Structures are given as C-alpha cells and as structure tokens.
Amino acid sequence: MPAPRYKSGSSKKVYRKAPGNSSIVHYRRKKQSKAVCGACGALLNGVPRGRAVEITKLAKTEKRPERPFGGNLCPKCVKKMMVAKARNF
C-alpha cells in the first residue's frame, strides 16, 4: 500500500529500474497545465508553467508579458479587441 501522501491525484507515478533488475516507483508532483487565451484558447507564450509555490518566487515581470491583458489574452485577440473598441468609440 502506498503512503497516504502518495494517493493524491496531484502525484504522478514514475517507474524506475533499480539495481538487480527490480522496478521501483518514484512519485513526482504534476506540473500545472499551460496557460491558454481566454478568448480563443491558444497557448500563451511568456507565462511560466509550474505550481503556485514555484511561481510566487518569480519576479513580477517573469510571471506574465508586460502588455495590456498580458497573461490572459493572446496578442491576436488583444489586437482584435482594441481595433473593435477604437471603431466603436
């Protein structure tokens, strides 16, 4: 039986070969999924992938791009939105 801390869904099983041709199980923390655009669902560049504990240690400029809606929308969607707002203004 695995220890209770390894039964969580946030742990990932990794099988390793040990000397003597026996296999053992290592447990690793799963990575967070990649950030996606809120409008079109495209993957966002410049946004780190990791657990919240790891991301809080990064500087503010390393967490997301320094532009309007950086980290939430992709550049194409931001451009479309700004053009649409300028035309309706």
Curated annotation (Swiss-Prot):
Organism: Methanococcus maripaludis (strain DSM 14266 / JCM 13030 / NBRC 101832 / S2 / LL)
GO cellular component assignments: ribonucleoprotein complex; ribosome
Keyword Nucleotide-binding: no
Source superkingdom: Archaea
Annotated Pfam families: Ribosomal_L34e
Protein name per Swiss-Prot or TrEMBL: Large ribosomal subunit protein eL34
Gene (name only): rpl34e
Single GO MF annotation: structural constituent of ribosome
Spans annotated as Disordered: 1-22
Keywords annotated in UniProt: Ribonucleoprotein, Ribosomal protein
